[in-house]
Amino acid sequence: MLREALRIGNRRWYSYKSVRRPNLGATGTPKMEPPKEQPEASSKAESGHGSLAKQLRAKILSTGPIPVAEYMREVLTNPQAGYYMNRDVFGREGDFITSPEISQIFGELVGIWLVSEWRKMGSPSPFQLVELGPGRGTLARDVLKVLTKFKQDAEFSMHMVEVSPFLSKAQAQRFCYSHQTLPEDAQLPHYQEGTTASGTKAFWHRRLEDVPQGFSLVLAHEFFDALPVHKLQLVDGKWQEVLIDVASSDGAQEASFRYVLSRSQTPVSSLYRPLPGETRSCLEHSLETERQVGLLAERIERDGGIALIMDYGHFGEKTDTFRAFKQHKLHDPLVEPGSADLTADVDFKLVRHIAETRGNVHCCGPVEQGLFLQRMQGEARLEQLLAHALPENQEIIRSGYEMLTDPAQMGTRFKFLAMFPGVLAAHLDKYPVVGFS
């Protein structure tokens, strides 16, 4: 499959023309195709930051300190002032940039990986391409190109799991020929639908549970790092939860927050049970990650399919990773809530443990992003693009791929983990999963 996809010759198999992605070293600001709604939405978001801080302050003063997870959820997804809800936060002009935005090679190789493993499973049809938290839709668009080219006679549909009305429209503009938002009283499992230029149907859902049953190829790129985490600390042999309180209660207009240690057991600290071999005295634990991974595992066991999780993270050794990013720089997560992205590294040890205990699922990885892309013949694809690129674009293409694979940049920090039906374990041992071995 890889040789077929990466063949270089007169027919230029799979040699789409290079796409001009942002030059990260340039002093000028590249155009990133912002959705038309951006100016109005951005203004709305800016005006909401102060009100969100006041809402959080009022809640804390009335009910007491809140878990970091509750703070994180409210800051990111508050319907009126949540960070993701009303504006474009991606790219050079946003607060962070993701791998698919840096280089088309990323999405193309992910697409080739999906096709390769799908074919090894017998090319079931119809199937679903599902993405959790699709961002701008760049990864979905790049993978769509690959699937459309190599799906043979198979039929498939696209299903995006997205809570942000703003981002769902941006995604539809990215890869759909036409799209529409459905009435609120439609009583359907999706709230938006569209059709791509190649005729593929696309649907938007607010929850993974709303995606129809069926064989699915599931992508989760920088999805789990945005899920709320609880911060726990071991004190005198007992786990206590780190909470967020107001810095003062004197009625000051300027809302300010601080971390405090719970005075007594919270529901999370009382129920938390560390994984075998746990040695940390402080850690971050995501109940929402447990829930989402459990849903994925149950779906794969029941319906068949593959899930590929791509995110920055660790294997159960890090302690304090909760942080904020604003305009590509670290930012205090307790200052101006709603104005910056909140994130925490994914605990891949927890992800793998939940997947393998909640369902009959076989996991591969995690492996480092740089290693995965190299094993997927990323250098060969890079040379293809360079050979057909304009001279002024060659350094942009080369530096983008270097950023994805360089150990000092994104190559080791980002990890890939794959989930397969457990019944395929022996088959996958005999025919190793490309990119993971």
Curated annotation (Swiss-Prot):
Its main location: mitochondrion. Residues 21-49 are annotated as: Disordered. It is found in: Mitochondrion. Keywords: Methyltransferase, Mitochondrion, Transferase. GO terms for molecular function: protein-arginine omega-N symmetric methyltransferase activity. It holds the Pfam family Methyltransf_28. InterPro entries: NDUFAF7, NDUFAF7_sf, SAM-dependent_MTases_sf. Its EC number is 2.1.1.320. It catalyses: L-arginyl-[protein] + 2 S-adenosyl-L-methionine = N(omega),N(omega)'-dimethyl-L-arginyl-[protein] + 2 S-adenosyl-L-homocysteine + 2 H(+). The keyword Ligase does not apply. GO terms for cellular component: mitochondrion. One of its GO terms (biological process) is mitochondrial respiratory chain complex I assembly. Belongs to the NDUFAF7 family. Arginine methyltransferase involved in the assembly or stability of mitochondrial NADH:ubiquinone oxidoreductase complex (complex I). This is Protein arginine methyltransferase NDUFAF7 homolog, mitochondrial. The lineage of its organism: Eukaryota, Metazoa, Ecdysozoa, Arthropoda, Hexapoda.
